[in-house]
Curated annotation (Swiss-Prot):
It is an enzyme of class 2 (transferase). [4Fe-4S] cluster binds at C113, C200, C297. GO terms for molecular function: 4 iron, 4 sulfur cluster binding; metal ion binding; quinolinate synthetase A activity. Belongs to the quinolinate synthase family. Type 1 subfamily. It comes from Vibrio vulnificus (strain YJ016). Its EC number is 2.5.1.72. Catalyzes the condensation of iminoaspartate with dihydroxyacetone phosphate to form quinolinate. Pathway: Cofactor biosynthesis; NAD(+) biosynthesis; quinolinate from iminoaspartate: step 1/1. Keywords: 4Fe-4S, Cytoplasm, Iron, Iron-sulfur, Metal-binding, Pyridine nucleotide biosynthesis, Transferase. Its cofactor is [4Fe-4S] cluster. One of its GO terms (cellular component) is cytosol. This is Quinolinate synthase.
């Protein structure tokens, strides 16, 4: 069973939307980025939720597109000395934790994540210290400082198995930061979980009422839902899973139409695998409401061509990720604990946002 803290409604200030580029400007930046990647011994690594042109450029230049842990692992294995991470700040930190000897650049260090922002390390540590008998399990979508306070770091693809393992040992659990994913796992496992009250601004906006209406319009469509969505939305799903798992489900399910309840950035890779299928954005607001994120992370949208080119060309403290070495070593412990557990289960760890 889960014990839920009082919900604190937080309205995160969104960054301004990037200024659109002309086709000529895009072509010029792409050409410059390709040249700079060679000159700087760098590789472009992009998250599924970045804009399609960024994902396409990463693949075209021998880089990678994936979820945050896959991104960090690819960067660790790649011979390039510099990794340019197109994503949000904790993804750059994850890459630095796994590969401290490499230079980690980001298009902007102001690309945040509402899950990270909603789980400040000092407050989370204070909360954990108040419950010393609990095992602390945190989602990968957190800062290095929060990871360092945890006993386990998990992604959504292995969270169920790890919580089941801890529950079998009768260990009460503190889960942070996503309340929807935590509630989903608690309901699936029956584990005793104390939930931190964070949420993803994109997934939190998906509406069950609006989704039912859309399903009535597309009765033959399958509904794919990320478990960071509200429980009422998850209940309507034909498939629930991480980014990688939803892409796999789109390929394996027989339906030719898919209503997809996650960031619409995923459509680029999903459509590559199922070009014959129709992908439909799940509605992010009910009748009479307006959306804020509108199914696309506003911080992911900051990873534009101009920002990537500037990061590669100029570098500097405005673009480079640094993690205190003592903190890095401490945060690596719960991360390796997950990877070792996955190896014993012979699972490939994927699936945080």
């Amino acid at each position: 069973m889960s014990h839920i803290l009082d919900k604190i409604d937080t309205v995160y200030p969104f960054p301004p939307k990037p200024i659109p580029l002309t086709q000529d400007e895009k072509a010029a930046y792409i050409a410059s980025i390709k040249q700079l990647l060679k000159e700087k011994d760098a590789v472009l690594i992009a998250h599924y939720y970045t804009d399609p042109e960024i994902q396409a450029l990463a693949e075209e230049t021998g880089g990678f597109v994936g979820d945050s842990l896959e991104m960090a692992k690819f960067g660790n294995r790649h011979p390039a000395g510099t990794l340019i991470i197109a994503g949000v700040r904790f993804m750059g930190e994850s890459a630095k934790i796994l590969t401290p000897e490499k230079r980690i650049l980001m298009p902007t260090l102001e690309a945040e994540c509402s899950l990270d922002l909603g789980c400040p390390a000092d407050k989370f540590t204070e909360f954990c210290d108040a419950h010393p008998d609990h095992t602390v399990v945190v989602y990968a979508n957190t800062s290095a400082a929060v990871k360092a306070r945890a006993d386990w770091v998990v992604t959504s693809s292995i969270a169920l198995e790890i919580v089941e393992h801890l529950d079998a040992e009768d260990k009460p659990i503190i889960w942070g930061p996503d309340r929807h994913l935590g509630s989903y796992i608690a309901n699936k496992t029956g584990a005793d979980m104390l939930l931190w009250q964070g949420e993803c601004v994109v997934h939190d906006e998906f509406s069950a009422d609006a989704l039912r209406k859309m399903k009535a319009v597309y009765p033959d469509a399958a509904i794919l839902v990320h478990p960071e969505s509200p429980a009422s939305v998850v209940e309507l799903a034909d498939a629930v899973g991480s980014t990688s798992q939803l892409i796999k489900a789109a390929k394996e399910l027989p339906q030719q139409k898919m209503i997809v309840a996650t960031d619409k950035g995923i459509f680029f890779k999903m459509q590559q695998l199922v070009p014959e299928k129709e992908l439909i954005e799940a509605p992010t607001a009910g009748a009479g409401a307006t959306c804020r994120s509108c199914a696309h992370c506003p911080w992911m949208a900051m990873n534009g061509l101009k920002a990537i080119e500037t990061a590669l060309r100029e570098g500097g403290e405005q673009h480079e990720i640094f993690v205190d070495e003592a903190l890095r070593v401490k945060s690596l412990i719960p991360l390796n604990r997950m990877l070792d557990f996955a190896e014993k289960l012979n699972m490939q760890v994927k699936g945080n946002v």
